[in-house]
């Protein structure tokens, strides 16, 4: 008899060994799991179906964004910001360009400030539409995703019309924005699905300017939000999956540095747009929705209410922009490129253009921290300059990183199925978490 067979028989005949049972087991949740929202990897220690401990692993989407920004001139790193939270692109840009403007002591024209405010809120609605659709899909409500993407597609067209890109816009610039709002919206082309009267009906709202299109959007959007709420807010299954699940107390939210809907869902009224106004948020009227219980359901209600408030802000910005034409970029050619027409007639303008896009501009030595109220929370940019044309240090404060850090403290004691609901309400995007 072989030694292996002897050892096997001895193990099988041992009465003590045969009675041993595994109480807790470890399970990998993600990064391939459909509810992982990107590349989330959670190591869950389970006691049956109950979560005993959660260990989030990060870094699978790390691209060294901060170091990349430190190797480029200041004005060439704006596109990197779009690729952090790639659902809330322009809000990321806003924090970065505000930091540069703070160090240089420049201020964007008033019209550019209103445009930034308007597009920050367009971005917020886009983010929350993606969130409500994907979170509902995670919990089994498939129809909401189709409804939400109907409106999100219209806002993607607005992005494309103003910047040429549906996602990575690179529209904000130090000193203003890339260009003024276009006079017309993209039109649907004839296809085998859309032709004749149907095509004309789809293009009916796109005959005017972008501001006309957005004005019509703000008039119809509240009724669309009502449709989402009809599907979810009083839905018995939705409430069973979210009410009293993932409760985050105000003290816990503060201790983990939570911001945005995660913090306001726990009843803390903190919003940088009100507490530390930037752009033109001090000139528009809106309210800050807050929750009471701090559970997944409250965080859902806060985000739905935020979409309504963002719609109010966009409507006010559209009204002001229609009545007040003006420049959207500073006229300092050391910071802003000259017009193409000017470069054809003026050699000095051509030199400015060449210098600006070859070596950029030198930012005075100093350091600053600039933060914006992004859809997921406080997105901040700490920028340090040594007087050169490249940043000495760039540090990005991503709200999702702080929120993910609290995962272990929040999920303990809940069932595995509840973890999916909690991850959904965290609204994680790993471009910003891993950076």
Curated annotation (Swiss-Prot):
Reactions that this protein is recorded to catalyse: a quinone + NADH + 5 H(+)(in) = a quinol + NAD(+) + 4 H(+)(out)
InterPro entries found in the cross-reference section: NADH_Q_OxRdtase_suD, NADH_UbQ_OxRdtase_49kDa_CS, NDH1_su_D/H, NiFe-Hase_large
A Pfam family hit: Complex1_49kDa
EC identifiers of the protein: 7.1.1.-
SUPFAM superfamilies linked: HydB/Nqo4-like (SSF56762)
Keyword Membrane on entry: yes
Subcellular location: Cell inner membrane
Keyword Translocase attributed: yes
Gene3D superfamilies referenced in this protein's UniProt entry, alphabetically: Cytochrome-c3 Hydrogenase, chain B
Record's GO cellular component terms: plasma membrane
Disulfide bridge positions per record: none
Stated role: NDH-1 shuttles electrons from NADH, via FMN and iron-sulfur (Fe-S) centers, to quinones in the respiratory chain. The immediate electron acceptor for the enzyme in this species is believed to be ubiquinone. Couples the redox reaction to proton translocation (for every two electrons transferred, four hydrogen ions are translocated across the cytoplasmic membrane), and thus conserves the redox energy in a proton gradient.
The protein, known as: NADH-quinone oxidoreductase subunit D
Source species of the chain: Xanthomonas euvesicatoria pv. vesicatoria (strain 85-10) (Xanthomonas campestris pv. vesicatoria)
Lineage, top ranks: Bacteria, Pseudomonadati, Pseudomonadota, Gammaproteobacteria, Lysobacterales
């Amino acid at each position: 008899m072989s030694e292996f067979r002897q050892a096997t028989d001895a193990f099988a005949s041992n009465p003590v060994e045969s009675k041993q049972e595994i109480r807790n087991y470890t399970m990998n949740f993600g990064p391939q799991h459909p509810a992982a929202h990107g590349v989330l990897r959670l190591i869950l220690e389970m006691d049956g179906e109950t979560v005993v401990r959660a260990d989030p692993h990060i870094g699978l989407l790390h691209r060294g964004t901060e170091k990349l920004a430190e190797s480029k001139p200041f004005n060439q790193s704006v596109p990197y910001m779009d690729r952090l939270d790639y659902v809330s692109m322009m809000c990321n840009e806003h924090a970065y360009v505000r930091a540069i403007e703070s160090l240089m002591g420049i201020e964007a024209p008033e019209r550019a400030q209103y445009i930034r405010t308007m597009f920050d809120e367009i971005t917020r609605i886009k983010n929350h539409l993606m969130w409500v659709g994907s979170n509902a899909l995670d919990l089994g409500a498939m129809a909401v995703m189709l409804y939400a993407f109907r409106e999100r597609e219209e806002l993607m067209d607005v992005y494309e019309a103003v910047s040429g890109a549906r996602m990575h816009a690179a529209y904000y610039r130090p000193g203003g924005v890339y260009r003024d709002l276009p006079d017309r919206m993209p039109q649907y082309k004839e296809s085998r699905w859309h032709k004749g009267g149907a095509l004309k009906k789809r293009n009916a709202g796109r005959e005017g300017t972008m501001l006309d299109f957005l004005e019509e959007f703000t008039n119809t959007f509240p009724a669309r939000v009502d449709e989402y709420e009809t599907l979810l807010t009083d839905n018995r299954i939705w409430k069973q999956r979210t009410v009293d699940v993932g409760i985050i107390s105000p003290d816990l939210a503060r201790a983990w540095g939570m911001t945005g809907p995660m913090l306001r869902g726990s009843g803390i009224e903190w919003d940088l747009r009100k507490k530390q106004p930037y752009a033109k948020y001090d000139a528009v009227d809106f309210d800050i929705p807050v929750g009471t219980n701090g559970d997944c359901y409250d965080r859902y209600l806060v985000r739905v209410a935020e979409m309504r408030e963002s719609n109010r802000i966009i409507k006010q910005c559209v009204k002001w922009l229609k009545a007040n034409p003006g420049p959207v970029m500073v006229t300092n050619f050391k910071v802003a490129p000259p017009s193409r027409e000017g470069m054809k007639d003026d050699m000095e303008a051509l030199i400015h253009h060449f210098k600006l896009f070859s070596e950029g501009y030198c930012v005075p030595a100093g350091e600053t921290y600039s933060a914006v109220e992004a859809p997921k929370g406080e997105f901040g940019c700490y920028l340090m300059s040594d007087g050169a044309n490249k940043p000495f240090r760039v540090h990005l404060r991503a709200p999702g990183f702080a929120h993910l850090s609290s995962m272990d403290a929040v999920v303990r004691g809940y069932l595995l199925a509840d973890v999916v609901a909690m991850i959904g309400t965290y609204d994680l995007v790993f471009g910003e978490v891993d950076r």
